[in-house]
């Protein structure tokens, strides 16, 4: 028997001892988010949700720099489950994972896994698996089982099986029977499930001493069903049946599988057997089966099952009638479909738009359409006709027949020239039921024409609507104007705006801002200014995103001066300036015309009564510091503080970096004091600048002191910080100390670049410790870090190589490295 091996295992464990209490059904994918949060943490979670939901979002938001040190796993889990969109949750999770001092636990990973699984974001879910393994966080069997189920729900069977083995090998979790059941369930979620994999996992369970229960065999049954192993599936089913575990869920798996395999007769036989055992399938299963029978073109069996449902007292809903009528329509059984339609009416269930759409769209002959209309015409009123139109249009649109929807409306308006007269229109007119569609239906068709890139047809339809005495709604104009603007047709959109005004339809703020955005996209600041005059007439405000975009676009095209002039013209039209756009202009001037021009605009803005914000000050301070004009930046910094603005950590970092690069290390240190006074905590960027500056000033002991201070504040160094300290110590001749931090960097799996290796090598050579220097050199070569010829460190590598060639203690080893192809044959060693 195909299933004899599994049956034997079941019997063996049944004899060993009495079966323990059955494990609960695996946890639902809905996370228990009742973990207690302190009020301050709850407020923190809400603030993070607000920041990440706010548009536009920036990971450099000053508020995030303030909130990040307070992160913990409970807060992260709460925030993740507070987002309605998976993308925001994933953005937040990645941001949180990178914050210094924070480390995810399995609850946080499970929260993210559940969100990604429900959203079917498999690529991100795969990345999360790698992150879980790299984190080496310990987990309970239950938590691990939940993670496995999330992978299974997303169809990531290979990943679920792989992570199961890896976690077990790494000693992060000891799986129990529940964990194995979750893995089996995950495997069963995939239609391409491997029978061999399932049976291998069952053997592992046996070797671990775990019992097989209903929740073990149910996914096994599902796998056999998924893979079309009908005989094995029947064997498992019989085993479950013999143990008294048969329930509605298990029965549903097999009967639905029979339906999927096209074995409708066997499915029907199984249903009758279940009835004999007093196991009733639920209403949903009956509906699924009827749908499957219809899909298999077994309308006869579908109606037999339908009759069985009615005898059991199950009343069909409109969705089930829809499936049956759809099947009848597919087989062109018009009379039976109409008979069922009349039954719906007799039962008091109003036919919905889907059924009307199927009846009207499935039959194309004039006689058939006349027959349908004869059945429904007596019951339809104006509202029903509108419903019919809407159903027809939805059917047209669903089938990408937007042109047919357009022709139908033209027929209703008496325009028959192109495609002839619609038979439905004739029938409606014969019974005085023909009326024009309402504004909503017309708007749907116009919107679909626009989406189908048939803007010209939409314009024609709009004009015909006006000629027939209908007043188009603002939505119709907005849709067409938006479509024109997406195609860059700003002139035509302005013309339609004039027609809109002539028709007595007031444009909305959306209407004008669509055109404004189009003009901004084309860098047409003259046209944009003319449109602003129209906005002022209607009392609308231009969207700052379009103004800012236009300014940025002009600056990107090297027209920063035009951008500034445009902002002046905007103010001249009576619109209040916005610092976001002004800051964009300042930034553009700095990049195009230099820092002085940006500073000049900044002063003009202040002179005109505007109050620059923190971002505007930061842009200038950062630019001045980069230009080695930190003294001027300091004046601006003090000016900002005097106005009550709080500098961000990023602004402090710019100042500290500027002072350090100019050799004013003590002034940089004074900025640290001001940060603490301002209740701002230095971050890793702050300390990196300080450490680099202290080493450059010949104060390596103070650099190490700051390093230890940073780690003591749970601010952990990153790769750049390590490299700054190592290279700085090397320049100060502290090669031994630099090597210690180099090894620590390697332990943290941070990869040094060639500059770090060469700094160490050069430092050891300077102290005449050629053996230590050559050891580091060999490491660099073996790890493939020898710089290529275009690398700025290439000549330094050539120089140190020359020194090793000249030394008898290292030249022979160097020859071997060259022969092995690990370093290029340099001109300096070509004689070897």
Curated annotation (Swiss-Prot):
Assigned GO CC terms: mitochondrion
InterPro entries with a match to the protein in the record: Pentatricopeptide_rpt (IPR002885), TPR-like_helical_dom_sf (IPR011990)
Transit peptide residues according to the UniProt entry: 1-27
Subcellular location per the Swiss-Prot or TrEMBL entry: Mitochondrion
Similarity comment: Belongs to the PPR family. P subfamily.
Lineage: Eukaryota, Viridiplantae, Streptophyta, Embryophyta, Tracheophyta
Pfam families on file: PPR, PPR_2, PPR_3
Keywords, ordered alphabetically: Mitochondrion, Repeat, Transit peptide
Ranges for the PPR repeats: 105-139, 140-174, 176-212, 213-247, 252-281, 282-316, 317-351, 352-383, 385-415, 438-472, 473-507, 508-542, 543-577, 578-612, 613-647, 648-682, 683-717, 718-752, 753-787
Protein name: Putative pentatricopeptide repeat-containing protein At5g08310, mitochondrial
First and last residue of the signal peptide: none
């Amino acid at each position: 028997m195909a299933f004899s091996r599994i049956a034997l295992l079941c019997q063996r464990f049944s004899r060993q001892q009495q079966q323990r209490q059955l494990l609960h059904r695996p946890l639902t994918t809905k996370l228990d988010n009742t973990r207690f949060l302190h009020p301050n943490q709850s407020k923190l979670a809400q603030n993070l949700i607000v920041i990440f939901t706010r548009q536009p979002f920036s990971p450099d938001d000053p508020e995030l720099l303030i909130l990040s040190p307070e992160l913990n796993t409970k807060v992260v889990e709460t925030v993740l489950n507070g987002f309605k969109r998976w993308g925001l949750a994933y953005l937040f999770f990645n941001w949180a994972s990178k914050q210094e001092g924070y480390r995810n636990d399995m609850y946080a990973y499970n929260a993210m896994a559940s969100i990604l699984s429900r959203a079917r974001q498999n690529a991100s879910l795969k990345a999360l698996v790698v992150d879980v393994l790299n984190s080496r966080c310990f987990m309970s069997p239950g938590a691990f089982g939940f993670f496995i189920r999330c992978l299974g729900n997303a169809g990531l069977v290979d990943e679920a099986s792989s992570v199961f083995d890896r976690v077990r090998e790494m000693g992060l979790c000891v799986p129990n029977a529940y964990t194995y059941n979750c893995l089996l369930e995950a495997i069963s979620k995939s239609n391409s499930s491997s029978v061999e994999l399932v049976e291998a996992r069952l053997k592992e369970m046996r070797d671990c001493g775990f019992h097989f229960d209903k929740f073990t065999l149910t996914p096994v049954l599902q796998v056999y069903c998924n893979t079309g192993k009908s005989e094995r599936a029947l064997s498992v089913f019989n085993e479950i049946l013999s143990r008294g575990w048969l329930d509605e869920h298990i029965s549903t798996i097999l009967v639905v599988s029979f339906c999927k395999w096209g074995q409708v007769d066997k499915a029907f036989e199984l249903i009758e057997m279940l009835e004999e055992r007093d196991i009733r399938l639920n209403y949903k299963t009956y509906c699924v089966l009827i749908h499957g029978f219809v899909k298999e073109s077994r309308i006869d069996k579908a109606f037999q099952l339908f009759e069985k449902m009615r005898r059991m007292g199950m009343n069909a809903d409109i969705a089930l009638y829809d499936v049956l009528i759809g099947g009848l329509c597919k087989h062109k059984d018009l009379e039976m479909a109409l008979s069922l339609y009349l039954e719906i009416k007799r039962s008091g269930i109003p036919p919905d738009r889907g059924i009307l759409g199927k009846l009207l769209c499935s039959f194309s002959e004039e006689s058939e359409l006349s027959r349908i209309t004869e059945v429904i015409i007596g019951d339809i009123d104006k509202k029903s006709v509108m419903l019919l139109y809407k159903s027809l249009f939805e059917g047209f649109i669903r089938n990408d027949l937007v042109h047919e929807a357009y022709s139908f409306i033209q027929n209703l308006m008496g325009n028959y020239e192109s495609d002839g007269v619609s038979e439905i229109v004739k029938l409606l007119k014969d019974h005085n039921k023909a009326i024009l569609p309402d504004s909503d239906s017309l708007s749907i068709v116009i919107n679909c024409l626009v989406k189908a890139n048939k803007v010209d047809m939409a314009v024609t339809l709009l004009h015909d609507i006006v000629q027939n005495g209908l007043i188009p709604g603002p939505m119709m104009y907005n849709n067409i104007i938006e479509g024109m603007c997406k195609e860059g047709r700003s002139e035509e959109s302005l013309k339609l705006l004039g027609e809109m005004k002539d028709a007595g339809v007031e444009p909305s703020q959306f209407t004008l801002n669509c055109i404004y955005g189009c003009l901004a996209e084309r860098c047409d600041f003259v046209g944009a200014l003319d449109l602003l005059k129209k906005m002022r007439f209607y009392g609308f405000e231009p969207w700052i995103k379009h103004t800012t975009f236009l300014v940025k676009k002009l600056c990107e095209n090297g027209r920063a001066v035009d951008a500034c002039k445009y902002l002046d013209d905007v103010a001249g039209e009576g619109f209040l300036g916005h610092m976001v756009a002004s800051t964009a202009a300042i930034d553009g001037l700095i990049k195009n015309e230099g820092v002085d021009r940006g500073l000049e605009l900044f002063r003009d803005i202040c002179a005109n009564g505007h109050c620059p914000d923190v971002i505007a000050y930061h842009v200038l301070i950062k630019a001045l510091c980069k230009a080695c004009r930190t003294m001027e930046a300091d004046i601006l910094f003090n000016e900002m503080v005097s106005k009550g603005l709080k500098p961000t950590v990023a602004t402090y970092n710019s100042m500290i970096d500027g002072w350090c690069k100019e050799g004013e290390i003590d002034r940089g240190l004074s900025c640290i004091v001001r940060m603490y006074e301002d209740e701002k905590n230095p971050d890793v960027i702050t300390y990196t600048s300080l450490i680099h500056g202290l080493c450059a000033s010949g104060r390596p002991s103070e650099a190490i002191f700051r390093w230890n201070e940073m780690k003591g504040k749970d601010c952990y160094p990153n790769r750049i910080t390590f490299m700054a300290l190592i290279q700085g110590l090397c320049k100060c001749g502290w090669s031994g100390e630099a090597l210690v931090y180099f090894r620590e960097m390697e332990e943290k799996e941070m990869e040094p670049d060639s500059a770090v290796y060469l700094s160490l090598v050069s430092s050891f050579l300077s102290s005449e410790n050629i053996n230590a220097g050559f050891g580091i050199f060999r490491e660099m070569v073996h790890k493939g870090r020898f710089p290529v010829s275009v690398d700025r460190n290439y000549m330094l590598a050539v120089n140190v190589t020359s020194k090793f060639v000249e030394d008898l203690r290292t030249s022979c080893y160097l020859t071997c490295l060259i022969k092995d192809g690990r370093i290029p044959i340099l001109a300096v060693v070509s004689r070897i």
